[in-house]
C-alpha cells in the first residue's frame, strides 16, 4: 500500500489547488508589475513628450516668455527730421513734450480714509484744503509758460478756471491709477511740477519732519504752517503721486504758412498729409532698442552688458520753397479770396520754368497744421461748400444693412443729423493745386497756339477771321460779349482771347494731332510732383472720342479738365524751349549734421515742342501783357519787367449756376518772366469768385499776379527790361475812390509800389479813401504809395535817426518805419530832410545827403 507522499506531482497539484489565495496573490503580483512597468513607460513618454514640446515644438515661445520675464526691451525713439525752406528757415521741427498724469489712488495726502467698525469697509473723503492747495500749485505752473512765472498767471481768467477744474476733476478720481492732468507740456513746466511734488511729498512724508525742516520746506513751497490744537506745527501725512511721460510733438512755427504743402502728423508722430506723408520714411528714421535685465518688479537692472541698438534719426528736407516768396503769395491770395468772396477757395503757384522747382504753393482758406482737426475758422466757408455741392458731400440715411433709404420718388433721403466733421476736415486739408480738376479756359489757348506753331499749322502772323459767331456741326461758338474781332494774327487773337480764332486753329491741327500734343504736354497723366494725393482721375476725350465739337471746345479750354499744376507745367514747357519738367518741392535731403544725402535734380520728361516754336509762344504771351495799356493781360504788368501771360475765365466743372442764373466761373492767370528768357511762372486761380462788378479773370486774377511779381521779381533778381529809370520821377495818379485792386494795377504799371495801410482782408474790397504821397506829386521811380480804406487822414510815424549809417542801411530803416527815401551822394548819411524823432505821415520821402 502506497503512502500519500509516494507521488510528488500529485501532492504538489493537490497543494496548489488547495491554496487559491496564494494563486490570486501571485497573479496580482504579475499584474502589478505589468502595471508598474506600463506606468513607468507612460510617465517616461509623457516626460519625453513634454520635453519635446517645451524644448522643440514650443521652444521658441517658452524662450520668449523667459526672455520677457528676465529682459526689458525698451524703444529708443528716433528723432524725426526737420523741414527747412530753401534758405534754411525751419518750417517743421520736433520737440520733446510731456504728458503730466496722476495716480489719485496713491495720492493719500488728498484724502481722509475712515473705516467702518462693523463692515471694515474704507471710505475716502477729499481733503478740500489739500486738494485746493495742490490743484492751485499745479495749475499755476501749467499756465506759467516757464514753470516759474506763477505771479503772471491771471487766476480770474476763464483759461485758469478751466485748467484748474480739469486738474481737480482728475485728482478727485480716487479709485483711478491713471488720470491725465495736461498734455504737450514743455520741459520747464514739467521740471517745475516735479520739483513741487517732490518738495510737497517730503513735507508730508509719513516718517515725520522736524519743526525746523518743516518750516523750510513749507517756505520753499510758499505755504504757511498749520498748527494743532496745542499750537505745535502740524502737516498732513501722505503723498501726491504725479508723474510725467515723455513724448514728441511736431511743431510748425508759422502756423497756417504753406500748410497744404507741409501737411501734418498724427498723434503717433506719423505723417498723414503733405510732405510729412510723402516723405514719411525719409523723415521718420528708424527706432532703436535697449535690452537690459529686469528685476522682480519689472524695473531695469543697471548692467554694463546691456545691449543697445542705436536709433537712426530721420533725415531733413530742404525745400525749393522760399518763405519770402511764399509770404507774398499767401498775402495777396488771401486778399483776393476775401475781396472777391471766392466760394470754392483759391490757389497760387510760383515755379521755376526750367527746373520745375516750386518756389511757392498755396491754397486758401487752409488750416493750421499745429491743430489740423480744428476747422472752426473755416466753418462758414465749409458749410457753404458742402451745401453748394450736395452731390459730392451730402450724407444719406441707410438701413441696418447699409442700403440707402429712399423716398416715394426713389430719391435718397439726406440725413439731417449727419456729422460732417470728417468732410469739413478733408476739404480744408486739400491741396487745391493737385487734387482738384477744372476747365482751364483761355489759359489753354497758349497750349493750342503751341500745337499750331510746332506742327506748322500756324505762325505768329497767321491771320484768321472772327465774325462773332462760328458753327461746328450743330454747335455755335461765340467770343466773350459776342464781339466780332475781325481779321487777326496769332498774337492779336491771344490778346483778344478770341474763341473763334482758336476753334479754327484747333481744326487746322486736327483731332489726332491735337490729342497727341495734349498727351505730350502731360495732361493725361500726373505731373509726378513729390506731394501725396495728386489726383489720378483725368477727365478728357480719348483720341477716338475727340470729335469735331469736342475738339472745338477743347481748343479754347472748355472741354478737358486738368489740375492747376498740370497747367503750370504745360505752360512752362511752352516757354522754356519745349521741355516738360517734373515739378518738385524738395530740393535736397540732409542728415542730422546737415550733410547732403540726396539732391533732387531737374527731371526733363520729354521735349514737347521745338525751341523755335517756344520762342514764338514767348513773343505772343508778351504781346498779351504788353506795357499794361492794352488788353486784359496788361493788369499783370509791372513797370521795368518783360512779362508774358494769359488769362482764363471758364465755367465750373460741374456747371453749377449762381443765384442770377449764370454759370459759376473760375478765374485764372498764368504769367512768365522775363518774357524773352523765362525763369519763373506765377499762377493764380480763384474758383467761383462773387465780384458784383465782373467775372473776367483779367480783372480778378491778373492784378493778383501783378502784385506778386512786383515784390518777388526784385527779390529774385529777375532781369529787367534794360531801361535805366534811376533818377526819373513819376506822377502819382489819383486813386481816391478807386477799388484797392485797381489801385494796385495803376501803381504797378507806373513803377510805383503800394502798401495798404489797413491790411485786414475784409477791407481789401473797399474804396481808397486817402493816399500819400498825394495825387499829382512827382516822386522818384519805385516810391511806395500808402493807401487807406478806412480814414481820410494819413497815419503818422516817428522818423528814425539814420545819420552816420550807410545809405543802404538807412534806406532799410526808413522803409521799415514806413517812409520813402532818396539818396544824394555816397558814403554815410550826413543829414536827413526830416528831423530824427519828428512825427510825419507814412509815405513821406526822406531825402538823405551822404558823404
Regions found by a protein language model. Give the residues of each.
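Extracytoplasmic
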Residues: 76-79, 86, 93-97, 176, ...
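Soluble non-cytosolic domains of exported or imported proteins
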Residues: 78, 125-132, 183-187, 269-273, ...
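Sec-exported extracytoplasmic/periplasmic mature domains
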Residues: 139-148, 198, 266, 284, ...
